[in-house]
Amino acid sequence: MNEAIIQLDHIDITFRQKKRVIEAVKDVTVHINQGDIYGIVGYSGAGKSTLVRVINLLQAPTNGKITVDGDVTFDQGKVQLSANALRQKRRDIGMIFQHFNLMAQKTAKENVAFALRHSSLSKTEKEHKVIELLELVGLSERADNYPAQLSGGQKQRVAIARALANDPKILISDEATSALDPKTTKQILALLQELNRKLGLTIVMITHEMQIVKDICNRVAVMQNGVLIEEGSVLDIFSNPKEALTQEFITTATGIDEALEKINQQDIVKHLPANALLAQLKYAGTSTDEPLLNSIYRQFEVTANILYGNIEILDHIPVGDMIVVLEGQAENILAAEKALHEAGVDVSILKRGA
């Protein structure tokens, strides 16, 4: 089992503005393992960005303990490292943002080289390093282009290369794909996954989009009003969300709410027969495809009319939703429901026939 490379224990962050006290983060504990792609999700103002800024102490907490790669960096209300040791620690932590923060008057390779200005490498070694980094992010042919000549996705690739210049062990992505179109977002996420695999990079993803968490992360924390309300593997959170906000994020990512609106307009649902019901089937790692639905027909003479189906592969395990009309004798439908539950399927009755 991987060890935690980031340990945030009982973190409080309080700001004082004139007569107001703002509790931005309240007693949050998060442990992130080496090699994780860890998502922190929440709406604007949830405290996500404020929390992760304590990892490299760009933001000092009010209370709590921070341990990064085995070193206690903050405890008992104060920084535990010397100024030099803190600078060194920060080099182990790269950051990318929604806004690329590239220098307009410098080329792509010059922007990356700027991150190496305090490096002990020789001039030749720095030049080779920059070439390697641009190759790593798939941008070597754009090395001499200025930011104005690059697309949004290409600018973010330069920013990623720059963030990796000092060989960090941790990369923090603060809404790094928010300004990108969906296609470019997928390409950047694929690049981050590749860097995670190739370099063993631990990535902390701050986002308000559960779709991004679903696409790239293996663990996720959900924040609301400065509080961590739910945390776990992406598989567990998607298959069994406990908090209302988490459920809201997941329905947005899966599109189930939009599907239900359309389904409710269909004649078959508007005029549901007395011996039928509309049900949502949720499952993780269980087959709810044709064989299982066929088996409830064979055993109980209950037919299943599939109106909607969505399946995702999370951590190599199928997780999905189906909306079906189950039709048959009342006692047979009850028996079919029980059989589905026993097969690991969560059955929610949305409407009963009149």
UniProtKB/Swiss-Prot annotation:
Reply yes or no: does the keyword Transport apply.
yes
Name listed for the protein in its UniProt record:
Methionine import ATP-binding protein MetN
What SMART domains does its record include? AAA (SM00382), NIL (SM00930)
Main location as per UniProt? membrane
- A Gene Ontology molecular function term of the record: ATP hydrolysis activity
Question: What is the stated purpose of this protein?
Answer: Part of the ABC transporter complex MetNIQ involved in methionine import. Responsible for energy coupling to the transport system.
Originating species? Streptococcus pyogenes serotype M12 (strain MGAS2096)
What Gene Ontology cellular-component terms does the record carry? plasma membrane
- Which Enzyme Commission number(s) are on file for it? 7.4.2.11
